[in-house]
Amino acid sequence: MMKKIAVLGAGSWGSILANLLDENGHSVRLWSYSPAQVTELNEKHTNERYVPDFKYSETLTAYSNLTQAIDGADVILFVVPTKAIREVAQQVTAVLAKTHQRPIIVHASKGLEQETHKRLSQVLAEEIPTELRQAIVVLSGPSHAEEVARHDITLITAASADESAAELVQQLFMNDYFRIYTNTDVVGVELGAALKNIIALGAGALHGLGYGDDAKAALMTRGLAEISRLGVALGAEPLTFIGLSGVGDLIVTATSVHSRNWRAGNELGAGQDLKTVIDTMGMVIEGIPSTKAAYELAQQQNIEMPITEAIYDVLYKSADIKEVIPQLMRREGKPEIQ
């Protein structure tokens, strides 16, 4: 079942997913806005800024021209930063209006649109042609590009209101080291993906401050409770948060040095200021804008999210990171399950 697939976004995750699909026997075109990156991928088969010391398939072709990249595609996979997804979707829609294609639209980005607090499938649904909206598929779960690149075992979720679309995407990606489960709870899968980055910032900060495993386990457990509370209030299924796109993604993101959100939190905990952390990372730290969006959603929904609020205070109100933890610990005693 060879398909023509356009992958939009040549960062670490987008480029490695494109390489996986190419290795699975599909015809893959990888789009990047950077002509220099396209040249590197096509001539050297490398992407040193994002995935150092890795050789991409020689049959994988990169493009800087969006029209060429998506021409004839059966599937279009968005793997661009959250802040860019609406603009890129508008550009894709302009091309589709001329070509009259009806591809399946998939996204593997993790975040919430900061200005609107919308999930990314909602953003896509507002921009893509009407007839493509019902079959949007979300790819999410515990995954690091570096590990997929070396064929480590990885399991993630494909979620869609259209079960047949999710099953098609499942078959595109599955192989000996990459397994996908389907789910119909798009809301829960997307919120798990976005909100776990906030908790990963906190876990990294605890490490940078010198706290041990007890504190990190407590943070992840209570953080998952916050994610679930907000998610259910916004229409998610509770069980989704104990699945791959919930607790699975939280564990891998909040415990691994591969996680840019964990690394950013670690630097903040070690005493670096936020601007320096952002400047030195060189890649998007989705947990930062997601913290603001989640905090404001919690206020609107009247949902208690003390960990998220503490991280928001550090990021957006210049609160002292060493002081917010004792403040959390001194909160009024409560039942664990409410």
Swiss-Prot record:
<keyword id="KW-0444">Lipid biosynthesis</keyword>
<feature type="binding site">
    <location>
        <position position="12"/>
    </location>
    <ligand>
        <name>NADPH</name>
    </ligand>
</feature>
<dbReference type="InterPro" id="IPR008927">
    <property type="entry name" value="6-PGluconate_DH-like_C_sf"/>
</dbReference>
<dbReference type="GO" id="GO:0046168">
    <property type="term" value="P:glycerol-3-phosphate catabolic process"/>
</dbReference>
<comment type="function">
    <text>Catalyzes the reduction of the glycolytic intermediate dihydroxyacetone phosphate (DHAP) to sn-glycerol 3-phosphate (G3P), the key precursor for phospholipid synthesis.</text>
</comment>
<dbReference type="InterPro" id="IPR013328">
    <property type="entry name" value="6PGD_dom2"/>
</dbReference>
<keyword id="KW-0520">NAD</keyword>
<feature type="binding site">
    <location>
        <position position="249"/>
    </location>
    <ligand>
        <name>sn-glycerol 3-phosphate</name>
    </ligand>
</feature>
<feature type="binding site">
    <location>
        <position position="286"/>
    </location>
    <ligand>
        <name>NADPH</name>
    </ligand>
</feature>
<dbReference type="GO" id="GO:0005975">
    <property type="term" value="P:carbohydrate metabolic process"/>
</dbReference>
<feature type="binding site">
    <location>
        <position position="259"/>
    </location>
    <ligand>
        <name>sn-glycerol 3-phosphate</name>
    </ligand>
</feature>
<feature type="binding site">
    <location>
        <position position="143"/>
    </location>
    <ligand>
        <name>sn-glycerol 3-phosphate</name>
    </ligand>
</feature>
<feature type="binding site">
    <location>
        <position position="110"/>
    </location>
    <ligand>
        <name>sn-glycerol 3-phosphate</name>
    </ligand>
</feature>
<feature type="binding site">
    <location>
        <position position="260"/>
    </location>
    <ligand>
        <name>sn-glycerol 3-phosphate</name>
    </ligand>
</feature>
<keyword id="KW-0547">Nucleotide-binding</keyword>
<feature type="binding site">
    <location>
        <position position="13"/>
    </location>
    <ligand>
        <name>NADPH</name>
    </ligand>
</feature>
<dbReference type="GO" id="GO:0008654">
    <property type="term" value="P:phospholipid biosynthetic process"/>
</dbReference>
<feature type="active site" description="Proton acceptor">
    <location>
        <position position="196"/>
    </location>
</feature>
<keyword id="KW-1208">Phospholipid metabolism</keyword>
<feature type="binding site">
    <location>
        <position position="141"/>
    </location>
    <ligand>
        <name>sn-glycerol 3-phosphate</name>
    </ligand>
</feature>
<protein>
    <recommendedName>
        <fullName>Glycerol-3-phosphate dehydrogenase [NAD(P)+]</fullName>
        <ecNumber>1.1.1.94</ecNumber>
    </recommendedName>
</protein>
<feature type="binding site">
    <location>
        <position position="260"/>
    </location>
    <ligand>
        <name>NADPH</name>
    </ligand>
</feature>
<dbReference type="GO" id="GO:0005829">
    <property type="term" value="C:cytosol"/>
</dbReference>
<dbReference type="GO" id="GO:0006650">
    <property type="term" value="P:glycerophospholipid metabolic process"/>
</dbReference>
<keyword id="KW-0443">Lipid metabolism</keyword>
<comment type="pathway">
    <text>Membrane lipid metabolism; glycerophospholipid metabolism.</text>
</comment>
<dbReference type="GO" id="GO:0047952">
    <property type="term" value="F:glycerol-3-phosphate dehydrogenase [NAD(P)+] activity"/>
</dbReference>
<keyword id="KW-0560">Oxidoreductase</keyword>
<dbReference type="InterPro" id="IPR011128">
    <property type="entry name" value="G3P_DH_NAD-dep_N"/>
</dbReference>
<dbReference type="InterPro" id="IPR036291">
    <property type="entry name" value="NAD(P)-bd_dom_sf"/>
</dbReference>
<dbReference type="GO" id="GO:0051287">
    <property type="term" value="F:NAD binding"/>
</dbReference>
<dbReference type="InterPro" id="IPR006109">
    <property type="entry name" value="G3P_DH_NAD-dep_C"/>
</dbReference>
<feature type="binding site">
    <location>
        <position position="145"/>
    </location>
    <ligand>
        <name>NADPH</name>
    </ligand>
</feature>
<keyword id="KW-0963">Cytoplasm</keyword>
<feature type="binding site">
    <location>
        <position position="196"/>
    </location>
    <ligand>
        <name>sn-glycerol 3-phosphate</name>
    </ligand>
</feature>
<keyword id="KW-0521">NADP</keyword>
<dbReference type="Pfam" id="PF07479">
    <property type="entry name" value="NAD_Gly3P_dh_C"/>
</dbReference>
<dbReference type="InterPro" id="IPR006168">
    <property type="entry name" value="G3P_DH_NAD-dep"/>
</dbReference>
<comment type="similarity">
    <text>Belongs to the NAD-dependent glycerol-3-phosphate dehydrogenase family.</text>
</comment>
<dbReference type="Pfam" id="PF01210">
    <property type="entry name" value="NAD_Gly3P_dh_N"/>
</dbReference>
<feature type="binding site">
    <location>
        <position position="284"/>
    </location>
    <ligand>
        <name>NADPH</name>
    </ligand>
</feature>
<dbReference type="GO" id="GO:0046167">
    <property type="term" value="P:glycerol-3-phosphate biosynthetic process"/>
</dbReference>
